[in-house]
Amino acid sequence: MLEAECDEVELTSRDVGDYLMFKTRITDNFTGDLTLNINTSNLIKFKTCSFFICYGDDKDRYELGWTSTSTSRSIFQHYKDGKYIRDFRIQDPFPILSGSTFPVVISKIIANRVAFRMSRRLNNVIVDKLKNNIIEFLFVVYLDVDTGKIKPNTILKNLDLSSLFIVFSNNGNNKINLPYEIELQTKDRGIVYTKMGNPISYNLFNKFEDLLDIETKGVDKPEDKPKPVFDDKGKQPTDTVPPVDNGKPDISKPGEKQGDIDIASKFNNIVMAKLKAQSSSDPLTKKQCDQLMLSLIKWFEKFGITKDNARLLIFQFGISFSTSKENLNNITNNIVVENDKGGFVKILKIDYLNKLYGSIPESHTHNLERVLLRHYAQEILILLRSKVLEWPRKLARNKGIFEQYAYMACDFFDTAELELTEAETTALTTVKSWTMNHYKKKRQIVNSSQLE
């Protein structure tokens, strides 16, 4: 067991960096759909990290995920018999935006086939079902390997695991309780520390530190530091570091690395990026959206509109008049709704938008209406299917969507994050293919001289 004697640990120069690996077995027998939502706003705090969702075992598996070194890349690759298949590898560089999410989807389809999809980067790559029907999730963060000192617990204290990723099953209705394994690699000592954990729900803990209980032994004991001085207002300085919780001893043992993925050996001289606080221009969190929704409902109640109708009205404004910024200043868009006294009230969308933006004290560069509705997109989709909400038929005609699927024309829908039926996916794919071919023909004609 390691002893906690100081806050910092001395590192020496070496070829391969230290890393922290978190691995969890999602299922031993994959039989349905699985969606893994990655919160990339937390991942971009680190200069180098990787996540993969793996289908199969250590001998034969497909790996779908994302890695960030000098550039961010989505990767889909096949690992078999101790090596990666060279003719089966898909890479796609792309920028990671603050506050964005990155869905990874695996679907079981008929005839023993499995389909992979990754947000807007990879669309339905179909492979044969493997003999070992196992799904695992792998997350790796690389630590500082420069000579000097680092604070090993800083990365653990600042990484919120519950907001890093959320696993959904059964069409997003249930969270999964998963067993986990954590591996801390320290090459300078030639030791690998591992810890196994019992199944736990991700909403029961917040930090990696709550799982690890890892205490790091330092080379030299630091001098006693003076206590922080409080200002006149009694506030503690922001640069003070919270104490390390040295509660339970670590269950540690030396041994070789688990599995065949040796990601750390591919990188040299990796430096952990400085952590940054979330800026005021980031999109809203789920908690902020729920609070904002309650505030808007109370505003509608002043007009005698019930809570249920107010919620539907918020959804209908975005559906009927779209959420594009071009419509923000339209003073004619309105909905007439019945109040609790049997009368009718005319609500202008511009008044609703003024209330929406006025409810947020910080300034935002994002389209707040679109961000808000995307948090409730799955609920809205169900209401549209049931025809509780009016369909955007005009927008559907402009997009060329079939009449029976006109409800899919909402401009705030991110179809990569929705649970769609096969028919809905086919309808949208047909429209997308037609649009791409239509504009491809236009791009082939540069000027009128080409027609001669």
Curated annotation (Swiss-Prot):
Keywords on record: Capsid protein, Virion
Signal peptide: none
Superkingdom: Viruses
Region called Disordered, residue ranges: 219-258
Pfam families: Closter_coat (PF01785)
Basic and acidic residues composition-biased segments: 219-236, 247-258
Subcellular location as annotated: Virion
Annotated GO CC locations: viral capsid
Protein task: Minor capsid protein that encapsidates the 5'-terminal portion of the viral genome.
Family to which the UniProt record says this protein belongs: Belongs to the closteroviridae minor capsid protein family.
Protein name per Swiss-Prot or TrEMBL: Minor capsid protein
